[in-house]
Amino acid sequence: MKILILGAGTVGSTAAESLSEENEITVVDLNARHLRELQDRLDIRTVEGHASHPRVLEQAGAADADIMVALTDSDETNMVACQIAYSLYRTPVKIARIRAVEYTARQELFTPKGVPVDTIISPEQLVTDHIEQLIHYPGAHQVLDFAEGRVRLVGVMAKAGGPLVGQELRQLRRHIPHTDARVAAIYRRLENNGEDEARYETILPQGDTVIKDNDLVFFLAARKDIRVMMSELLRLEHPVRSIMIAGGGHIGFELAKRLEGTNRVKIIERDPERARHIAERLKSTVVLTGDAVNEGLLEEENIESVDVFCALTSAEEANILSSFLAKRMGASKVIALINRPSYAKLVEDQYVDIAVSPQEITLSALLARVRGMRLDVGQVHALRSGAAEDLEAVAHGDEKTSKVVGKAIEDIPLPPGSTIGAIVRGTDVLMAHHDTVVEAEDHVILFLTDRTQIPSVERLFQVSVSYM
């Protein structure tokens, strides 16, 4: 496919890298240096210029593009670019990142007769959803939905005291005989050797794999079984009651609005005007005007009794500092918005319990839409700074036209570093075992430790030309 990406920032660059294996990619940006850096490491075409100017879009090939993805830092530029691509070039699929709630709250704007955006990606909405899931499952590092939430991929840091820690995986069935779950991958921290950045070994587990203390374990389970499986890997934490949020922007405000009915919520916001604005719109949340890196303020507000401290400002350095301070002063758990993978790797596990990457979450939503052009895909989630992916693919065809339908999982030629974790068949959730047979229209949940194998998975699920 021919894909036109507008914006060579973090998300645009990562999207170009993720999609360049089997697509013709053109990236447009005003920054010549960013474009040169991309061309030096990827086989792509670049065009320097303003992303919403017709001349630039024409030069970039908008008339021939199958998909245009508008990922610049400006909502207005992204929307205008989609309008021009539709009006002048009839580009078939137009995807835009739109941050401002003032736009996304008015869905009636986004129609062919209005602003012709086919898919809106709203980072603020996606990040809020993600953090809400983490708070709902104390102890989880990631909670990702598949098959409309019937199956979830959960990442948990295994801790001594969990019944399965120190045991072979084959013992899982004996521990919880009435619960079916599948460990999809394990990331094991390697010896530091004086390096600042932690490195991990990737393990595709077998029955004799032993889970160790501090392993990051990703498992798949039906939604109803998540807590049972988590209890095998660590001592379950008590439900979250007290939450403190640093930053009253869109994410902090929306998260407080969702949680204040069931939790004690406080927001610390530096801007007095913004603090007044959100205080008027929240019911029981306590809104404080001040700086979250003010040790006296945190002490006064009893930071030591806070179950979860969320650093959600737009400045990741401030998020890191306030997280470090909150953790040192006794907050039970700290969640921080951190965009740069290099920052996240440095601080996670030491000063921040969970680093949430808006770029990675945005990329997941984008990949799901783009992969769906080649393959019938329900969900795609980027993991480990985009190095790994978990995806939901629908098996079409029959035994004659499909490479997967009618075959047991052990007989499916999966690419290296990939595994099938679960199958959703209608309303039933089936954990994948070696003799599980894939049927037509099954939703197959795959885990890939190496995203470069995605094209191989796409070919595996394609049906032959005789399929109608």
Predicted region positions:
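Cytosolic regulatory regions of ion transport systems
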Residues: M1-M468
